């Protein structure tokens, strides 16, 4: 092991063992915190707020009026990575980056019936799965309005992380139990999209809960803020909770911070259909546009099926998911549009099968599986392990150099997800076709600090 690798490994282990402890977790469910606010009257009108009593990291700064509130919450994640692609760990490389630098804006109005949410990421490091880009917004991640007529029904309008990706994407980047999302999520989850959504919360009797989610979006991701190039994406998710809801939003973060006294489980299935896919997985909309002989736009359809679960009990948690994607190509595609908008017709020598394979090769097609588990010790120190595998369709171009990934993480929670240190060791295995006598994968260690104000 090299000096660089030894150093970052030693730093990570020391920090995780030596820090003191303190707790708050994120949730996409709206709830009222039981803290007290201090007001100052102004002309008999509105009250202004300062930091509330009992303030915890992650609460943000909130301004209160008689009809609602307005919250600002910045967050920062710094990442230090050392990795090597050689079997003997020689010639390592190091990367120090700002992983996330976000500003969250949230407002509640009219007794929590209406909420507004926006999020900016000033450290966006998005890289398209395929080269080229027509339009892409790297800073604005969320901007939406939510209407809650009652506790059962919620309607959402705008840009946000979608309900119809894997369960990992329901968890904020600051609240996942690992430093990075899994190989499965990277391959198949578009995450952000612009559209109209519905979510429900139905009690079936006793402790049984059913949560349906419906989604109607552009299918172009954040590119849709400039133009919707393709058709639309339709999706549905159905979650079942047999043992009632999780404590304090525990459905929307990984480690069992509040040590569930009784077993909690959510099992879900999800399906989405994009009737006009223009990018590899719905992230970089408008990347690939095809047309018929008259230059009318023709696009492939892209469908995705998934199943997942999350279980928690007494400090333990386990989460897993499976994804399968397929596509269908129109038979009369005659060419494609270049990034400058001009049309490039395919040659007469290209067969229908070759054209079909060309279109399919630009989509993330295949299947994958991810499973992970972890335990939180009473001293707010957690350990976890994860295994992910991908099986690409034979026709699709390689959207990942790796087909298996093994990850081990330890996390020291100083104030819940609002202040924590994570250290991770991992190995991603190269696909057989890419292995050499000296390289069979990527070995890495990384250290990340997270703070949310």
Annotate each PLM feature.
Residues 84-91, 127-139, 169-174, 224-229, ...:
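Outer-membrane beta-barrel translocator domains and adjoining extracellular loop/strand segments
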């Amino acid at each position: 092991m090299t000096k660089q690798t030894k150093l970052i490994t030693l730093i990570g282990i020391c920090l995780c063992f030596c820090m003191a402890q303190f707790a708050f977790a994120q949730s996409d469910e709206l709830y009222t915190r039981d803290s007290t606010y201090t007001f100052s009257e102004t002309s008999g009108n509105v009250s202004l707020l300062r930091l509330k009593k009992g303030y915890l990291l992650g609460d943000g700064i909130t301004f209160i009026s008689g009809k609602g509130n307005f919250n600002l919450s910045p967050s920062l994640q710094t990442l230090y990575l050392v990795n090597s692609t050689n079997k003997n760990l020689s010639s390592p490389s190091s990367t120090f980056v700002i992983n996330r630098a976000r500003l969250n804006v949230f407002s509640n109005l009219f007794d929590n019936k209406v909420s507004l949410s926006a999020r900016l990421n000033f450290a966006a490091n998005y890289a398209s799965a395929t080269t080229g880009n027509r339009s892409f917004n790297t800073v604005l991640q969320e901007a939406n309005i939510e209407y809650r007529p009652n506790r059962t029904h919620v309607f959402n309008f705008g840009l946000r992380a979608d309900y119809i990706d894997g369960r990992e994407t329901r968890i904020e980047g600051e609240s996942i139990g690992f430093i990075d999302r899994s190989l499965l999520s990277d391959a198949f989850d578009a995450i952000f999209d612009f559209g109209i959504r519905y979510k429900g919360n139905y009690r079936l009797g006793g402790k049984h809960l059913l949560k349906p989610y419906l989604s109607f979006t552009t299918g172009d991701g954040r590119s849709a803020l400039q133009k919707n190039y393709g058709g639309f994406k339709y999706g549905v998710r159905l979650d079942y909770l047999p043992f009632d809801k999780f404590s304090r939003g525990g459905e929307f973060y990984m480690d069992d911070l509040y040590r569930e006294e009784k077993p909690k489980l959510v099992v879900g299935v999800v399906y989405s259909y994009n009737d006009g896919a223009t990018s590899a997985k719905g992230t970089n909309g408008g990347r690939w546009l095809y047309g018929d002989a008259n230059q009318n736009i023709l696009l492939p359809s892209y469908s995705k099926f998934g199943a997942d679960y999350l279980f928690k009990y007494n400090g333990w948690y386990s989460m897993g998911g499976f994804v399968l994607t397929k596509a269908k190509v129109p038979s009369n595609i005659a060419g494609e549009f270049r990034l400058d908008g001009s049309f490039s017709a395919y040659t007469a020598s290209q067969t229908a099968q070759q054209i079909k394979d060309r279109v399919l090769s630009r989509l993330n097609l295949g299947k994958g599986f991810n499973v992970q588990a972890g335990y939180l010790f009473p001293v707010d120190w957690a350990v976890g392990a994860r295994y992910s595998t991908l099986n690409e369709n034979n026709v699709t171009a390689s959207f990942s150099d790796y087909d298996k990934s093994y990850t081990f993480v330890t996390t020291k929670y100083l104030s819940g997800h609002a202040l924590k240190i994570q250290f991770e060791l991992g190995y991603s295995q190269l696909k057989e076709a890419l292995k050499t006598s000296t390289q069979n994968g990527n070995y890495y260690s990384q250290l990340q600090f997270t703070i949310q104000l």
